[in-house]
């Protein structure tokens, strides 16, 4: 017996795929409804506006990001190792065709208005990533944990942008080694 996907999930999964591959502004509700096979009335019953759908997607992606972060870093025995493990995994991901950049950067670029709901979710996510990097940098014994966290943050976002711009031929093959250089410079004696 085949299990049926709920209409709300069909809409969400379709929107998530389209937003990530093509952008938020480029994809309209008509396209999402047509691609999901769900009527617009049903779509609007679950997501009263496109912004609601964008926010739901970003919140779900935030949860995925942190679950992945924990999975990637849990076996690293030290804070330094956790940072390195994250950047090694990120390097592997941004070199794949599945990577279309960072959905949080993408939404902030397409909706630069600070009061846009998607922009707000993106800002919250990025602030929490910076805070986690800062915590790990401090625990790793960085001389200036704020500077190291910000450098790593910029490196991460640069890798996402390079993936979006260059696809699989991006300069990310040096991402993990660049992170290691920054970490070593702040934590070596």
Spans of features found by a protein language model:
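Hydrophobic alpha-helical connector segments
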Residues: 56, 70-96, 139, 145, ...
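Alpha-helical DNA-contacting segments of helix-turn-helix folds
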Residues: 54-61
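Basic, helix-initiating cap at the start of DNA-binding domains
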Residues: 1-22, 26-38, 52
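A secondary-structure capping/hinge motif
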Residues: 51-53, 107
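Short, solvent-exposed amphipathic helices
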Residues: 71, 117-128, 132-135
């Amino acid at each position: 017996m085949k299990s049926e996907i709920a209409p709300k999930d069909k809409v969400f999964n379709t929107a998530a795929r389209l937003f990530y591959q093509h952008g938020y502004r480029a994809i309209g509700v008509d396209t999402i409804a047509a691609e999901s096979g769900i009527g617009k009335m049903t779509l609007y019953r679950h997501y009263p506006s496109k912004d609601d759908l964008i926010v739901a997607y970003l919140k779900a992606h935030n949860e995925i990001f942190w679950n992945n972060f924990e999975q990637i870093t849990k076996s690293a025995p030290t804070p330094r190792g956790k940072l390195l493990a994250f950047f090694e995994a990120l390097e592997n991901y941004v070199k794949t065709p599945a990577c279309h950049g960072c959905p949080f950067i993408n939404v902030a670029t397409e909706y630069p208005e600070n009061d846009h709901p998607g922009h707000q979710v993106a800002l919250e996510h990025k602030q929490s990533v910076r805070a986690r990097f800062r915590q790990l940098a401090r625990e790793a014994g960085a001389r200036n944990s704020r500077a190291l966290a910000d450098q790593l943050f910029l490196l991460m976002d640069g890798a996402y942008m390079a993936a979006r711009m260059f696809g699989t031929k991006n300069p990310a093959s040096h991402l993990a080694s660049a992170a290691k250089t920054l970490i070593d410079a702040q934590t070596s004696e």
